[in-house]
Structures are given as structure tokens and as C-alpha cells.
A protein has these predicted regions:
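Short, P/G- and charge-enriched loop/turn segments at secondary-structure junctions
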Residues: 12-15
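Short, small-residue-biased leader/transition segments that mark boundaries at the very start
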Residues: 1-6
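Short loop/turn motifs at secondary-structure junctions and domain boundaries
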Residues: 17-20
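Active-site-proximal loop/helix of nucleotide/amide-processing enzymes and allied scaffolds
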Residues: 10, 28-32, 42-125
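Short glycine-rich loop/turn motifs
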Residues: 23-26
Length: 125
């Protein structure tokens, strides 16, 4: 639901909105989609962040998470996902599926708002 996505993006806004470089964070959830932990996965450069998918899954497995919400910022202000963002989302979804962990959303934040892969119907169910 849109209200869920709005709440999800608020989870990360204080960490990510004023940064001059990209960072990727994850929120780990229990089977009822309640956030149990937030983890910074990677600081990045001005235009993109490099993400080791193993670190995402390691954090989720260690927390016994059922779901993952990905979130990163675009310091440029653009809310449009890059081809790198799309590829990363797809790769993490495939890897997480093998572990029975759901990707609930991938949110991109900027000063002008947010973009939600879930809202746009871009996550594999």
C-alpha cells in the first residue's frame, strides 16, 4: 500500500537525504513485515554505490529476517532508477529468493521525494 511505502521511506530519510554521496541501507523485517533492524550496507560514490550482495544476505540471515527493504539515495536529486539500480535489484531478488527471503521494496530517496520499485510494480513476486 502507498501508506506502507511512505512509512518505509521515512525509515531512511534522516540517514540518507543530506548526503553528498550515495549509500545503500537495508531494513530487515520479521514475517509480519515489522522492521527488526536497519543496516548500512555500503557507502558509495557521487553517482553510484557498489554493493556486495553477500553482505545483504549475511545481514538478513544473521537477523533471521523474512524480508528486506532496500533503500539508497540519489544526491543528484533524480528519482529515476539507473540501469545499475535495476540490475542490482534483480540480482538481490534472485539471491534472496533462494533463501526464502522476500524483497519488499527498493526505495530511492532524494530531496524531491522517493521512488518505490514496489509502487511501480517492478518487483518479482
Amino acid at each position: 500500500a502507498a501508506s506502507d511505502v511512505y512509512k518505509r521511506q521515512l525509515l531512511f530519510r534522516t540517514q540518507l537525504c543530506d548526503l553528498p554521496y550515495e549509500e545503500l541501507w537495508i531494513a530487515l523485517t520479521n514475517p509480519l513485515n515489522k522492521v527488526i533492524q536497519k543496516v548500512k550496507i555500503s557507502p558509495g560514490g557521487v553517482n553510484q554505490t557498489s554493493v556486495d550482495i553477500r553482505l545483504v544476505l549475511k545481514a538478513a540471515i544473521n537477523a533471521l529476517a523474512s524480508g528486506i527493504i532496500l533503500c539508497h539515495n540519489h544526491p543528484s536529486g533524480s528519482l529515476r532508477p539507473s540501469t545499475h539500480d535495476d540490475a542490482l535489484t534483480e540480482r538481490i531478488q534472485k539471491a534472496a529468493k533462494l533463501m526464502d527471503i522476500r524483497i519488499l521494496d527498493h526505495i530511492i530517496l532524494s530531496d524531491s521525494g522517493y521512488y518505490s520499485y514496489a509502487d511501480e510494480g517492478r518487483l518479482v513476486r
